[in-house]
Amino acid sequence: RTHARGILAGGHIILGLPGETRDELLRQASVIATLPLDMLKLHQLQLIRGTRMAREYEEHPECFHLYEVDEYIELAIDYIERIPQSVVIERFISQSPRTLLIAPDWGLKNYQFIERLCGRMAERGTWQGRLCETVGESMGFCIDVL
């Protein structure tokens, strides 16, 4: 209803929550593609000191998959290939203060990450929405390639 009233609508997705698989995340992207979103923020799971999730990580690290930067770049590219070009991607990563961050610590600024992501997209010859077909203003559906 928000989108129908001309109000910009956005989504915020954390990639890599405990128990999520890569295949589930890519299926999720195909579902997100059908929503009337104008913008989308993505970022990696970050473990922050003093949080419940940090305690869960200490107790059950096997339940967490903390992406290495190159692995996350590949995932982010695969994800946005399923997101329509009409959706503005506002963020790919988040940065928490090092004093609070447990993991992952990639040591990259946002612009450095974007440079690497764009370079890898060029190497792969891909783009946002490559696996999507637009249906209306900002809704689409994605080709299931899994």
Pin down the residues of each PLM region.
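Radical SAM/AdoMet-radical enzyme domain recognition
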Residues: 1-14
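Alpha-helix C-cap/termination motif
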Residues: 5, 34-35, 82-83
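Conserved radical SAM core fold
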Residues: 14-19, 47-49
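Intrinsically disordered, low-complexity linker/tail regions enriched in Pro/Ser/Thr
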Residues: 31-40, 44
